[in-house]
Amino acid sequence: MGEKKFKHVMIDTETLGRTPGSVVRSVAAVEFDPQTGETGRKKVWKIDLADSIRYGFKVESSTLKWWMMQSEEARRDFVEGAETPLVDFLDDLDDFLSCVNEENDFTLWCLQLDFDVPMLRSYYAWYNLNAHGCDEEVLPWNFRKVRDVRPYMDALDSAGLLPPKVTDRHTPLADCLAQINYVHLVEKNNLVVR
């Protein structure tokens, strides 16, 4: 029997700003099944900070201050560890997502539609223009199949089923796994999402 094929991927980013064009420091992507909560491949990248700044991505002082006020463990996770060059990260994420489905026929999830996806779009816009000389938007996901976890959290909260946050580490992998759990709990309990 072959490896299970997943049709859903959760992504999460940790950044040094709240607007597109800000530095994306780390990204996680996790395949999952909303019905069962089962996860598949997981991948985490820590993007080379110097690359991001050299290529014109910005650091917002308010976000930098916010990171300085987080726990020592969260700050350490944010700063330490092997870094992936920016172009290698974009190629790797593209490969990860194309392994889900080469025709982009999968659902991409994130916590807020106006945060993670626009942050990554700005990186892909830079990449398409500077690495490929292409000013068209070429993304490794289908923009029609991007979903937001926030309404699922609202449905859980309304039903009194929203689990307490179990960590304050602010790592993209921990956030992805928590967000997958929210989606699964909504499916498991047949809650209405608005």
Model feature map: region roles:
Residues 135-160:
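Short, flexible loop segments at boundaries between secondary-structure elements
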Residues 92-95, 99, 118, 122, ...:
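Residue-level signal for well-ordered alpha-helical scaffold segments within enzymatic catalytic domains
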Residues 1-4, 194:
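Basic/polar N-terminal segments that are highly enriched at the extreme N-terminus
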Residues 107-113, 118-119, 158-194:
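Acidic, Mg2+-coordinating catalytic module of metal-dependent nucleases/exonucleases
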Residues 12-14, 116, 148, 175:
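Acidic active-site catalytic centers that drive phospho-/nucleotidyl reactions
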Residues 114-140:
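Substrate-recognition/cap helix-loop segment adjacent to the acidic, metal-dependent catalytic center
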Residues 3-9, 14-110:
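Conserved non-catalytic scaffold segment of RNase H-like nuclease domains
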Residues 14, 23-24, 30, 122, ...:
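Metal-dependent nucleotidyl/phosphoryl-transfer cores and adjacent nucleic-acid-binding surfaces
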